[in-house]
Amino acid sequence: MGAKVLIHKDNIYVFHDENVLGTSLELKVAATSQKNADRAEAAVLSEIQRESKALSSYDSASEFSRWAATRGQAVPVSKELFETLSLFDQWRARTNGALDPAAEAVIRVWKDAAKADHMPGQQELAAAVQTVRQPHWSLDASAHTATHLSSTPLVLNTFVKSYIIDHAANAALATSNVDGVVVNIGGDVVVRGILSESIHVADPRSDAENSKPLAHLILSDMAVATSGNYRRGFDIQGQHYSHIVDPRTGQPADGILSATVIARNPVIAGALATSFSVMGADESRKLASSMSGVEYQLVQRDGSKVESAGWRKLASPSMDLAMAAAPAPPRPLPVPQAGVWNAAFELDIILELTHFDFPVRRPYVAIWIEDKDKFPVRTIALWQQKSRYLTDLKNWYRADRMRSMAEGSDLIGTITSATRSPGKYTVKWDGKDNAGKPVKAGTYFVNIEAAREHGTYQMMRQEMDFSGTPKTAQLPGGSEIASATIEYRKAQ
């Protein structure tokens, strides 16, 4: 189970896995050797698996699922489940009900409405809200038991991922000769030990892996979590609604596009990120002011940003993080220059890696552009493993010019963002070459190459004309990449 080392630089070892807690894992370990880094990785994956077996709401065999099937019985539970239920009690009180595992009752009403393609009835929503408000369990600290009191569906999301990441990071640091660790699961990140990590905050309006971030943070011994409504939701009669609901009203929480929270305690970061997405700016500001060491950035529906007083202190000085009090005026579209890439357009490349039902290492992937003469123009993405296996990406590696520019680096860094599904990635091309200059309009080849260490190989290649007319191509899947969509369109 688990990934093998991807990058080794200055005694920092990097691992990637897919399908970890329903999303993707990035792990960085500062260790004295490959062997010690491997041990730290094994400790992280073991701790994640152990706690998932206790807390998962999606595994019918988990301790939580088995407890949820009981009614009115004082059931002895593990330390992790007891602590998690207790934390939910605390956060439900702190947020005046904005954070509640029983929100699943409301979410199911909206899911059913989306399937039927009609708005949910007010009576149905009111009934769901009423079931949320009742008590769902009682805890006995002396006996260490939990009694399930209601039949309301419960899902332990929100801060639970951060809770597990916290313990996984501690497990890595407990390994001999490991001095630092960064654990990033689905955009929730914990940085511990000697490492200082550069973290990009995804823009909810342009959330491709290589899109320009909203902010560039430098964190040490801290956690950051992001919640947002831009990757999932409900579509009803042509209208999109947030998958994040306010359990107090039964309505989708669509006032906040993205909420990013920094705190030393990962649980606080995770709980507040979700809560702020529900509560809105004013209520969030009030709650944050009652807690020390919490910084945040909210992106509101109109695009304006709300930031805590200390947010910019954690940002890289190279980034302009000026807070917008109101939405910026729309920029005029660039005037196309004859014979040059139309700057009003961009290329989206949407990949879905082949899905497995267990954690599996991410394959080597290179995505690059060639001109009509097959001359390499730009490497858009490079997901490395051990450098000696880069030759497995034989077509990309053959282009010496591209290799010399990108070898030894992973072109996508650590990102905090709303959780995405495992193996699903989007990257963009802005029509510029590796030197940052716009290319000529015309015909190019989009190349996607994937290889697994000691495993299978896949090459995808699509010719496309980039002259200002939107177009889409769907590439057939294969052993490593299940599907790929290439979309040339006006930039959003």
List where the protein language model places each region:
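Mature catalytic core of soluble alpha/beta enzymes
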Residues: 1-336
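Surface-exposed loop/turn motifs at beta-strand-loop junctions within extracellular Ig-like
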Residues: 433, 450-454
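A short tyrosine-centered beta-strand micro-motif
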Residues: 425-427, 439-449
